[in-house]
Every structure is written in C-alpha cells, then in structure tokens.
C-alpha cells in the first residue's frame, strides 16, 4: 500500500527546533523523525511514499536528494576514501513522491491534493508524521480489512499528565483524576483508509472534523487501541524520544528488533 505522510505543518510548539527545519526533519539521534517513521512502514513492506509538503518543503526535498547513506549504515572504505562499499542501504528500494500541498493547508486539503497520486489504490495508509509506535502494522490493517469500513485510526492514551475534573453547576468538584487513568483515548495519527474516503470530503474541510463526522454518522469509522505510542509535539516530548534513543531504548525501531510483535492488546 502507498503511505501518505503529512509533512507540511509549522511545528510551532517545538520552538527553536523548527526554526531552520520543518517538524518532520527534527532529529531523533542521527536521523529525523520522518526517517524513523518511513523505516517503520518499510519494515512491513510499504515503501511507496507520498510526502505532503508545505512549510520548508525545500528542506525535505534536499534531505532526500542529498541523502547520506553512511550515517546509519556500515560500509567498507578503501583507496583512501575513493572507494566506499555500503553493507546495506536504507532507501534504495523506496519510492518517494514529493507534492507541495501549500503552506497553510489543513490535513484534509493536503490529502485531497494528493488524491490523483492514489489512483488505482483500493486502500492506503496515512500518518501525521509526528509520532512513533511499535504496533505490528499488519494488526491494524487486518482489523480494518475485516471491518469493511471506510476509515480506521490508532487510538492511544493521552501522553500528558493532565487531570480530568468533573464538577457541578455550582462549581463543587465531584472528582479529579489523571487523564491517563480514565477511559479517554486520543487520535494517534496512524490511519488506514479506503479510496472512498474522498467521497466523504468537501473542499477546505479538516479531515478529522466534517469528513470524520460523516463517517461516524454512517458507522464507517473505527479505532484500533494500542498502548505503545510516542508523540513529538513539544520540546519536552522530543527530549524524551532523544533520551530513549541515546539510552538504546527505542522500541519503535522494529526493524532492529528480533521479536517485533509485542503481546496482544485489546481492540
């Protein structure tokens, strides 16, 4: 399946990290989060990518046009560096389509802009490109295919330690608890769609607002629950991911693990 990656946002909550590069190019270790995400999909055989570009689109194009294989691969050097033999390649079998979808476009507009590049695809994958997981990808795809629905997305626990408060009209507090201790789930940004998703979209609409509401009304939208998910929406979250990587604890790197299928989780 083709993979649509939304790479056009401003990433303002990452502060100085996105002054010179777009959010998808913010690095975790030696490589940007976009690379980690693409490696995840490629590990499961999905290597045909469509990048929906916007803010600093030139930076993303330049990154891949001048891709340096030696940073993340073993190689043998001889003749004083004139001859270099790579032991493996990251992206040799990837196909990447770069599409400028506008600086201020929302997710729905960006998806609509690449519809023609999905011609002939009965289903496709999509992603916000700002989060990582170790979810065995075939699970959510199989779950979606068996459902016969139009759309599916990963449902995860909120990553923050906010408190959920219930109160009465007079202001009296009934309860207070950590949001992660409640049944609250959020959209993890990993999607599977049938091509008919475009029938539910109108010009200018945000994907998860009007189109998703139509899917809900027609019982065509489902969610897949999974516990392991790491977002990179803030400077603090980026630091958490960087620390995990530096400590050798990067569970989203399923391409490195010997056993990539964690214990089943409730759907």
For each predicted feature, which ranges?
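N-terminal glycine-rich phosphate-binding loop and ensuing alpha1 helix
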Residues: 1-67, 98
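A structural signal for short hydrophobic beta-strand segments in well-ordered beta-sheet cores
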Residues: 25, 164-167, 223
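Well-ordered alpha-helical segments embedded in enzymatic catalytic cores
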Residues: 33-36, 109-113, 211
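Solvent-exposed polar/charged
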Residues: 43, 116, 214-217
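Conserved beta-loop-beta/alpha segment of the NTase-like Rossmann-fold superfamily
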Residues: 59-169
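Catalytic-core segments of class I nucleotidyltransferases/pyrophosphorylases
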Residues: 122-125, 132-145, 157-160, 172-267
């Amino acid at each position: 399946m083709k993979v649509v990656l939304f790479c056009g946002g401003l990433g303002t909550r990452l502060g100085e990290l996105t002054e010179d590069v777009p959010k998808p190019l913010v690095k975790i270790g030696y490589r940007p989060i976009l690379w980690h995400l693409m490696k995840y999909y490629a590990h499961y055989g999905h290597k045909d990518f469509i990048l929906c570009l916007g803010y600093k689109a030139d930076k993303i194009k330049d990154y891949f046009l001048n891709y340096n294989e030696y940073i993340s691969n073993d190689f043998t050097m001889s003749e004083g560096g004139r001859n270099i033999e790579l032991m493996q390649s990251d992206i040799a079998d990837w196909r990447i389509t770069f599409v400028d979808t506008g600086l201020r476009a929302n997710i729905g507009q960006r998806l609509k802009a690449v519809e023609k590049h999905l011609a002939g695809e009965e289903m496709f994958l999509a992603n916000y490109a700002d989060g990582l997981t170790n979810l065995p990808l075939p699970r959510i795809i199989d779950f979606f295919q068996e459902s016969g629905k139009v759309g599916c997305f990963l449902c995860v626990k909120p990553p923050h330690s906010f408190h959920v408060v219930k109160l009465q009209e007079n202001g009296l507090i009934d309860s207070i608890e950590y949001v992660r201790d409640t049944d609250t789930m959020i959209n993890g940004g990993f999607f599977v769609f049938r091509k008919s998703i475009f029938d539910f979209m109108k010009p200018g609409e945000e994907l998860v607002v009007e189109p998703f509401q139509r899917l809900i009304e027609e019982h065509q939208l489902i969610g897949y629950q999974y516990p392991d998910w790491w977002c990179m929406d803030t400077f603090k979250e980026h630091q958490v991911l960087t620390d995990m990587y530096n400590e050798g604890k990067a569970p989203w790197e399923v391409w490195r693990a010997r056993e990539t299928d964690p214990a089943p989780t409730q759907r």
